[in-house]
Amino acid sequence: MSWVQLRGHRFHFIQASFDAESNEAVQVIHITDLVRVWSCTCSRNQIVNQAESERCPIDPFQTFETLVDVLAEVLVNVSSESRIQLRGSNDEGSLKIFCTSKIAKDIFLEWNWTLWLTPPETIAKMVWFPLINHHLFESETDTSPGSLMSIIRDQKSLLNDKTWFKEALNERSSSSNPSTPRKRSAFADIISPKRPRTRYDFV
């Protein structure tokens, strides 16, 4: 499984697998902000119970495989038109995904997942080590659009292009006014702040 950018969320990436034939791990979902990882595993019974309680328009008994396929489509497919929202808990111990998708005329599918924060070492095991391995041993052309590696390469290309630096430098030069007298800098105030004169009254 590869990490792909979560649709509509610039700094969050998702890794997910869906297997309608499994009973215990039909859905395995991970989300990262590149600092932490949240995860959840959903069994067949959990999905069926949630579909019943939320009055899902797709029958979880007769068309369970279809339901799983649709959930995978709306959550992972970068070209899907579904809307995804993230909501974190106050203690950041859990993360909720809310997904809304139009599956037919005037028929909408609404679904949510609750992911739980994993131990700190998970970020290295699931994100950084695979990225290093990919960089060292795999072809640079072997990346799909929207994947974490492709986004990193795009940003690297942007940094290597010096045009942005020259434009920023020219903009800063044009905005400065050489006739303006230099003032005491904030940094100078920090290291040697101005002090008011102390008056001494002698008796």
From Swiss-Prot:
Q: What happens when the gene is disrupted?
A: Spores sensitive to ionizing radiation.
Where is it localised? Nucleus
- Keywords per UniProt: DNA damage, DNA repair, Nucleus
Q: Is-annotated flag, keyword Membrane? A: no
Annotated InterPro entries: XLF-like_CC, XLF-like_N, XRCC4-like_N_sf
Q: Which GO terms describe its molecular function?
A: DNA binding
Gene Ontology CC annotation, any one = DNA ligase IV complex
Cite a single Pfam family from the UniProt record: XLF_CC
Q: Which GO terms describe its biological process?
A: double-strand break repair; double-strand break repair via classical nonhomologous end joining; double-strand break repair via nonhomologous end joining
Instruction: Report the function annotation for this chain.
Output: Involved in double-strand break repair via non-homologous end joining (NHEJ); the repair of a double-strand break in DNA in which the two broken ends are rejoined with little or no sequence complementarity. Has a role in meiosis.
The record's family statement is:
Belongs to the XRCC4-XLF family. XLF subfamily.
Protein name, please?
A: Xrcc4-like factor 1
